[in-house]
């Protein structure tokens, strides 16, 4: 697994692209602040927007708040410089206070970013190489924490050549459509991001570009 870095297998080089995700962490909330927002069960939350946010409380009483931006850089570039994007954090902070207006004035103690690999089917794909001696999984699209254990078991099944319930799943057998090479990748991804944002502001109504991508099974997500 190479995560966001280029695949060592030529067949997979166009299967994923790296996108940058950004997150903020608040200072610890007081009991009064927790009461004000009514988040009693402290479960993790993700909204249903195309350019979605995710947020959850921490054990020491903070709120982790991230998402929205999923930024792609021309040529599938990965560079630590892309992790320092003040405008992304300012936008996230604005969205945070829109979500929790009761917490206006709360400060953020941490901010960070990182790249994830995304595939056109929004979930990992699997395969073998070197005559079946190597198994791989890639394209977790930000879902790796929950699915890597499953992926590890799938890869063990593939190495064993075993026909199991896992290896018979459509999501394991199917390969995603590849992303196009440059400059089509950058143009297509940025146009798609703009269309996704427009859909979020039009009660989810998708334009012709998104409907076409849906029809052919080609997508972009963070």
Predicted regions and their residues:
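Active-site substrate-recognition segment that forms the wall
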Residues: 1-32, 36-132, 212-222
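Short strand-loop junctions, especially beta-strand C-caps/beta-turns
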Residues: 68, 139-140
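Short beta->alpha junction loops/turns
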Residues: 115, 140-141
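C-terminal lid/capping helical subdomain adjacent to the catalytic/cofactor pocket in oxidative enzymes
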Residues: 130-135, 141-222
């Amino acid at each position: 697994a190479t995560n966001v870095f280029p695949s060592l297998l030529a067949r997979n080089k166009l299967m994923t692209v790296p996108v940058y995700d950004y997150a903020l962490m608040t200072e610890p909330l007081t009991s009064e602040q927790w009461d004000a927002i009514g988040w009693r069960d402290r479960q993790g939350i993700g909204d249903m927007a195309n350019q979605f946010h995710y947020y959850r409380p921490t054990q020491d009483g903070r709120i982790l708040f991230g998402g929205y931006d999923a930024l792609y850089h021309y040529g599938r570039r990965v560079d630590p410089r892309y992790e320092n994007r003040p405008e992304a954090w300012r936008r996230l902070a604005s969205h945070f206070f829109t979500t929790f207006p009761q917490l206006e004035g709360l400060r953020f103690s941490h901010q960070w970013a990182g790249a994830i690999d995304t595939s056109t089917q929004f979930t990992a794909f699997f395969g073998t190489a070197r005559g079946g001696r190597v198994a791989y999984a890639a394209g977790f699209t930000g879902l790796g924490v929950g699915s890597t254990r499953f992926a590890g078991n799938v890869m063990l099944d593939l190495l064993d050549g075993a026909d199991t319930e896992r290896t018979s799943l459509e999501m394991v057998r199917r390969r995603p459509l590849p992303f196009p090479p440059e400059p089509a990748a950058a143009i297509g991804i940025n146009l798609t991001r703009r269309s996704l944002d427009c859909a979020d502001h039009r009660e989810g109504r998708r334009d012709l570009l998104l409907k076409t991508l849906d029809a052919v099974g080609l997508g972009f997500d963070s």
